From Swiss-Prot:
Binds 1 zinc ion per subunit. GO terms for molecular function: 5-methyltetrahydropteroyltriglutamate-homocysteine S-methyltransferase activity; zinc ion binding. Keywords: Amino-acid biosynthesis, Metal-binding, Methionine biosynthesis, Methyltransferase, Repeat, Transferase, Zinc. This is 5-methyltetrahydropteroyltriglutamate--homocysteine methyltransferase. It holds the Pfam family Meth_synt_2. Belongs to the vitamin-B12 independent methionine synthase family. The keyword Transferase applies. It is an enzyme of class 2 (transferase). 5-methyltetrahydropteroyltri-L-glutamate binds at residues 17-20, 118, 520-521, 566, 610. NCBIfam families: met_syn_B12ind, PRK05222.1. InterPro entries: Cbl-indep_Met_Synth_N, Cobalamin-indep_Met_synthase, Met_Synth_C/arc, UROD/MetE-like_sf.
Length: 778
């Protein structure tokens, strides 16, 4: 009885980010579409060959995306937003939806990108589908079928992957009032019928249909819709219904009624669901168990997994499939490239290519292969050795964590009193202007960093080069007349990796890249041991920048929850414990910054919402310790020290109480893509502190006009008192170039100055009316 082995998807970016570099060359006009497509084809074939050479039963097709797999599905379904429809959809259409289109690049007066948000509780972003009640769907984008043909012609046994109809609808949003997007399901199912019919004609036996929303706490109408949907799209192609990121026990009674041929569940995220799934699994279904974690870099304990799976194999026989927990999109590509790792550390890890081999090894061992069983034993030994390593578990760190009290997470005085102290010290105007922290990482900076790391630049030479970039950033900001400056973060390759490189307990990699969105990739550090700060990290750069200007300089820190969410965490201790260790380290940095004369310190927490568990019943426990971690890091600040925080792409309604509980003096948020909709949560909650709603989208190359910014700030002022508003971009400017940055910021500053005058006139007029009323009454 041969065990079927497969994965849910493979990284699409290439082991050295080949796709990223090709995309960006294409966008700059340096290569044509044919050259870009050639790079994509080469990556796909290499990925399929990796899977086939390892011995997987299937090669996955349809997991490749030019920007995002949800956006690919949008084009597959002929569902392009109207503002981006210019003839038959092509690759440029896809990029317009994802990136937007400036007025200067077309005759259509520009078109905004679609919203982008987090993919469940990961750091991957997807482009949000837009729905209106007149929408129709038609299969018009051939990418999936072309890639199936490519794989078949290359000799692979293909399993296409497709985002399911209910998840596609659920992950989108209505763009007009008065209708429920679920009413579009019958029309959408017609398109899915056509897709499956085409795949059947191509000879496909199995298709993987991803319905990750089944791991959520779905409302009854959504859950009930599944039965009809899968009856309607039933075809000659066998369907593996795929779920991941959490347990599906809540939805299991509905799932087992569906017209499908198998179910995949994520045992890495929710191992406790196995017994319930086995008890209710239909007799004719296969069961795919995701036991190799697709979201991390840790070597799988295949010995333990084998022992766990053997009884399931005995019960199900060939109906048991072994798989990755989710797509390996969330893992780096290949550990073999990491020449700089010690043998011990290397033995702890497995990247996507190695995880494929783990899946295959488990399949062979389950089939009784004696050599594979012995290999499982040997492969798991480093995991056991790590459990007792003294350099992993540090007594000094444990002692400090154990001493945490409620008082440690409390600022010395309430916000209202702090605000008075800060107003006296900072002397800022109405609608103060600032940026979120980073400035363009120019090619010169990247070349110098590379030269330093390769030994071509000495430490002293590199430090002088960085000081030059900092001085340049300060000079540009002063010329723009921004109110609160930043040093620009030239010394940081990444907002998390930089801290990981300067805190004990982390391991960084050279090629550990994963996709964040579009062409943007991140290289998460790995928490390998207890975390501690051995010396100041940012103080020298911030104080140097402050010495160059009489304006206020913001210190820039990445918060404990974001560092946790944007790194690969340990599996042997809780996320809460890691967050506490990080908070204590950052608390020391806050103390040193203010002692060095930095009066404003930003502790970025853009990832705080994405850390939420998928089940709402688990939210409060997470939010309690996440808020505590932030407060521990900030609470060493004196009353006159203003603490800022920044959050990205967050839907705040369900966490607004916890956002307020952070007790940051100023919060900056991304709001421009949502046209200030996100501020409703702050308005309804009567959020008491200061807010900087982002007034332009830094993820798009479009430069906002002064009028655009004025309009957004006025909308914000309808929801938040103007005296508590700041004016700033949505996010850091690292990925933009200097001409774009300066043009946008010039419009931002001029908009703020114009609005100060307008609001001052309104205040004067109101005061005059009040005086006149008093005189009349007299």
């Amino acid at each position: 009885m041969t065990t079927t082995t497969h994965i849910l998807g493979y990284p699409r970016i290439g082991e050295k980010r080949e796709l990223k570099f090709a995309q960006e060359k294409y966008w700059r006009g340096e290569i044509d579409q044919a050259e870009l497509k050639k790079v994509g084809a080469e990556l796909r074939h290499k990925n399929w060959q990796t899977q086939a050479s390892a011995g997987l039963s299937f090669a996955v097709a349809g997991d490749f995306a030019w920007y995002d797999h949800v956006l690919t599905t949008t084009l597959l379904l002929g569902h392009v937003p109207k503002r981006h429809r210019h003839g038959f959809p092509d690759l440029d259409t896809l990029f317009r939806v994802g990136r937007g289109q400036s007025q200067s690049s077309c005759a259509c007066h520009g078109a905004a990108a679609s919203d982008m948000t987090k993919w469940f509780n990961t750091n991957y972003h997807y482009i949000v589908p837009e729905f209106s009640k007149e929408d129709t769907f038609e299969v018009s984008w051939p990418q999936l079928f072309e890639e199936v043909n490519e794989a078949v012609q290359a000799g692979h046994n293909v399993k296409p992957v497709l985002l399911g109809p209910l998840s596609y609808l659920y992950l989108g949003k209505e763009i007009e009032d008065g209708f429920d997007r679920l009413t579009l399901l019958p029309r959408l199912l017609t398109a899915y019928q056509a897709i499956l019919a085409k795949l059947a004609k191509q000879g496909v036996e199995w298709v993987q249909i991803d319905e990750p929303i089944l791991a959520l706490e779905l409302e009854k109408p959504w859950l009930d819709a599944f039965k009809l949907a899968y009856q309607v799209i039933r075809s000659d192609v066998k369907v593996l219904l795929t779920t991941y990121f959490d347990s599906v026990v809540d939805s299991l009674d509905r799932i087992v009624e569906l017209s499908v041929d198998g179910l995949h569940v994520d045992l890495s995220a929710a191992p406790e669901q196995l017994d319930a799934v086995l008890a209710k699994l239909p007799q004719n279904w296969v069961l795919s168990l995701g036991v190799v974690n697709g979201r991390n870099v840790w070597r799988s304990d295949v010995k333990a997994q084998l022992e766990r799976l053997q009884p399931v194999k005995a019960a199900l026989g060939e109906r048991l499939w072994v798989a990755s927990s989710c797509s390996l999109l969330h893992s780096p590509v290949d550990l073999e490239l990491e020449a700089g790792l010690s043998a011990e550390v290397r033995s702890w890890f497995a990247f996507a290519k190695q995880k494929v081999s783990e899946v295959v090894l488990l399949g062979k061992a389950l089939d009784g292969d004696a050599a594979a069983i012995a290999q499982c034993e040997a492969y798991s030994q480093p995991i056991q050795a790590r459990k007792s390593a003294a350099h992993v578990h540090k007594a000094t760190v444990q002692s400090r964590v154990n001493a945490i009290t409620a008082e440690l997470a409390q600022r010395s005085v309430p916000y209202a009193e702090r605000a008075r102290h800060q107003a006296e010290v900072l002397q800022l105007p109405l609608l103060p202007t600032t940026t979120i922290g980073s400035f363009p990482q120019t090619s010169e900076i990247r070349v110098q960093r590379s030269a330093y790391r390769s030994g071509q630049l000495s430490s002293a030479e590199y430090e002088q080069a960085l000081k030059g970039h900092i001085a340049d950033a300060v000079k540009r900001q002063e010329a723009l007349d921004l109110d609160v400056l930043v040093h620009g973060e030239a010394e940081r390759n990444d907002m998390v990796e930089y801290f990981a490189e300067n805190l004990a307990g982390f391991q960084t990699t050279q090629f550990g890249w994963v996709q964040s969105y579009g062409s943007r990739c991140v290289k998460p550090a790995i928490v390998v041991a207890d975390i501690e700060r051995e010396q100041p990290i940012t103080v020298g750069w911030s104080t140097y920048a402050q010495s160059l200007t009489s304006k206020q300089m913001k210190g820039m820190l990445t918060g404990p929850v974001t560092i946790l969410c944007w790194t690969f965490p340990r599996e042997d201790i809780s996320r809460k414990a890691i967050a506490q260790q990080l908070a204590l380290a950052l608390r020391d940095e806050v103390s040193d910054l203010q002692d060095a004369g930095i009066n404003i310190i930003q502790i970025d927490e853009p990832a705080i919402r994405e850390g939420l568990p998928l089940k709402k019943r688990d939210h409060q426990n997470y939010l309690d310790w996440a808020v505590e971690a932030f407060r521990i890091s900030a609470a060493s600040a004196r009353p006159e020290t203003q603490i800022h925080t920044h959050m990205c792409y967050s839907e705040f309604n369900e966490i607004i109480e916890s956002v307020a509980a952070l007790d940051a003096d100023v919060i900056t948020i991304e709001t421009s893509r949502s046209n200030m909709e996100l501020l409703k949560a702050f308005e309804e909650f009567n959020y008491p502190n200061e807010i900087g709603p982002g007034v332009y989208d830094i993820h798009s190359p479009n430069i906002p006009s002064e009028e655009w910014i004025v309009d957004l700030v006025k909308k914000a002022a309808q929801k938040i008192p103007v005296e508590r508003l700041w004016v700033n971009p949505d996010c850091g400017l690292k990925t933009r170039n200097w001409p774009e940055t300066e043009a946008a910021l010039a419009n931002l500053v001029s908009a703020a100055k114009r609005l100060r005058k307008e609001f001052a006139k309104e205040t004067t007029a109101v005061n005059s009316e009040a005086v006149a009323d008093v005189e009349t009454e007299a």
